Design a protein with these regions (language model features):
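Extracytoplasmic/peripheral linker and loop segments enriched in polar/acidic and small residues
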Residues: 19, 86, 154-156, 315, ...
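Periplasmic binding protein-like
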Residues: 33, 108, 397-451, 486-487
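N-terminal lobe/hinge region of extracytoplasmic solute-binding protein
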Residues: 34-90, 201
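Gly/Pro-rich hinge or "lid" segments in bacterial periplasmic/extracellular proteins
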Residues: 68-72, 148, 170-243, 359
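Surface-exposed binding/hinge segments that line
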Residues: 96-98, 115-117, 125, 129-187, ...
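Ligand-site clamp/hinge motif
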Residues: 192-197, 225-278, 402
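Append "and occasionally in soluble cytosolic enzymes with long acidic Gly/Pro-rich linkers
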Residues: 220, 227, 308-399, 462, ...
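Long beta-strand-rich cores associated with HINT superfamily self-processing modules
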Residues: 511-538
Length: 538
């Protein structure tokens, strides 16, 4: 959701696309930003992280999208490349769209209906962690296995601009999922490979014109935004700044210093715990703002191999971990909880199956008497996560294991722990931020059997329970009524009784900008975080 500047963008590119329809004094200029790590991907089919979605929200527009707004308003699904929300058949199985006229990619090619069909197929070809959202399309499950013949449940007419999607059964969350970046159309001929180093042409107000994985990337105005797409999609903002240059700066304290001094205009990640209070006290309301999130921080356990294939061991770790100790590590930026669903999510119901009890944890490990006591603890190299991983390693030692900490560059962390071929995937840190405001998003990607892949898996615990998977699928078909919310609360408890995770908190993030930026104008979208189109200079 990084070497002072990345390669300069040619002025001609900027001038060709300038203009969001305004001439306010704050328009124009170059926004200089820092991220603590390079996103998982800068490819819309693959990106599935808060950093990645912040980076691509204003470049790749799906058929539907989320309103560019703060809070609850930002969770509203609105038309993107489609003229309107779809016509949905009475049985909930058929969705009909029509593309807007005159749409162009940033390379000048016209956007056509078949580009959407290919985008969905590309998600499956690349084994994207987003593919479970679309397996209910007729023919998608078969295509996921064979990667041949196309998905027959999508019919696209390039002349008419009409797109028809047929589902195998109703899916109550399908509109929200279509508004995610995964299936944003891309031009015909886009390679079926990770394009993070050379991101594909854009349909949004900005295009990524340079990318150096691990170091940074830069944007210019899409030259076809003002010419075509802004007229076709007047509901979407065009952005104020002309260019954006992002640099990866791994030392969060240095980022704070740089933003204070005006060397950078914005740091995407929050201030580090040891600087958080200082920044909050000094700049809240003028340069700093705390942002609530729907998120869960947790430790996953690999349920497919010893010792965590034993329920007693998994429960022992839950008893041994003290969420309040982790809250202190994060200096209050994570508030302790022990549920899968975060407090603001429909279906949340507070419970505490595993109150901190080290003695009980030791007894469970003693009863299980696992033969394998050599544990690898995985985490990334961002400071709070590394400290959380160190804490977990010490807890495991306290209950009778030999634990080794494996710290991974945050750029590659989820690619490594999501890859089945990675050795010693025992237990590790992770966090999950909502994809869309529905409790299904906290269950299907992480606890359904269909979300286990050889690569890019989001089910990090490799948790496979047919009964739970069936319940997740059943609830996904239904409208989100109070009765269904109560069923999600029951599902939360049911999964945690099997203890594939150790949930320990829900997080807040922060927006920290230089004195040159108008903080009041910065939009914090609940799915995509800071909206690049909303940054403007005073």
């Amino acid at each position: 959701m990084r070497l002072i500047a990345i390669a300069a963008v040619m002025a001609a590119l900027c001038l060709a696309g300038c203009g969001s329809g305004t001439s306010d004094p704050g328009d124009g200029g170059v926004l200089r930003a820092t991220f603590s790590s390079f996103p998982d991907y800068l490819d819309p089919a693959l990106s599935h992280s808060e950093e990645g979605w912040t980076a691509i929200y204003d470049t790749y527009v799906p058929l539907l999208t989320y309103r560019h707004a703060d809070g609850k308003a930002g969770s509203e699904v609105i038309p993107g490349l489609a003229r309107a929300l779809p016509e949905i058949s009475g049985d909930g199985l058929t969705y009909r769209f029509r593309l807007r006229d005159g749409l162009r990619y940033s390379n000048g090619k016209p956007v056509v209906a078949s580009d959407f069909k290919r985008a969905v197929e590309r998600v499956f070809v690349l084994n994207s962690s987003g593919s479970p959202f679309f397996t209910d399309i007729v023919g998608a499950a078969e295509f996921a296995k064979t990667k041949k013949g196309g998905i027959r449940g999508i019919v696209a007419g390039d002349r008419s601009g009409e797109i028809t999607i047929k589902l195998t059964h109703p899916r109550g969350t399908f509109l929200q999922e279509l508004a995610l970046p995964f299936t944003a159309p891309l031009p015909a001929g886009t390679p079926d490979e990770d394009l993070s180093g050379n991101p594909p042409p854009a349909t949004g107000p900005y295009e990524i014109v340079s990318s150096k994985p691990g170091r940074g990337w830069s944007y210019a105005r899409n030259p076809y935004w003002a010419k075509a797409n802004a007229k076709a999609m007047p509901q979407l903002p065009g952005g104020s700044v002309d260019r954006i240059e992002v640099t990866v700066v791994r030392n969060a304290s240095s980022q704070v210093d740089d933003v204070e001094a005006g060397r950078y205009d914005w740091m995407e990640n929050p201030p580090p715990p040891d600087r958080y209070a200082e920044v909050k006290d000094s700049y809240e309301g003028t340069q700093f703002r705390t942002e609530a999130t729907e998120s869960t921080y947790f430790f996953w356990m690999n349920t497919t191999q010893p010792p965590f294939d034993d329920l007693r061991v998994r429960r022992a770790v839950n008893y041994a971990v003290d969420p309040e100790a982790l809250e202190r590590i994060y200096a209050g930026q994570v508030v302790s909880t022990q549920q899968i669903l975060p407090p603001g999510m429909p279906g949340y119901e507070r419970f505490q199956l595993y109150p901190h009890n080290l003695g009980k944890a030791k007894k469970l490990v003693e009863d299980a008497d696992p033969a394998d006591r050599q544990i690898t603890v995985w985490t990334d190299d961002e400071r709070s996560q590394e400290e959380a991983g160190s804490y977990l390693a010490e807890v495991l030692k306290d209950v009778g294991f030999e634990a080794k900490l494996q710290v991974v560059n945050s750029d590659n962390y989820f690619s490594l722990v999501g890859n089945q071929s990675t050795s010693n995937l025992d237990i590790g840190w992770a966090s999950w931020f909502q994809d869309y405001p529905h409790p299904n998003d906290f269950f299907q990607p992480m606890f359904s059997e269909e979300s286990i892949f050889p690569t890019n898996t989001s089910n990090l615990a490799r948790f496979a329970d047919p009964k739970v998977s069936a319940k997740i699928a059943e609830l996904a078909e239904q409208p989100l009524t109070p009765a269904v919310e109560a069923e999600y609360a029951d599902l939360d408890r049911e999964v945690m009784e099997q203890a594939p995770w150790v949930p320990y908190g829900t997080g807040t993030l922060g927006t920290f900008v230089s004195p040159a930026i108008d903080l009041d104008q910065v939009i914090y979208n609940p799915t995509f975080n800071q909206d690049l189109t909303s940054f403007r200079f005073k």
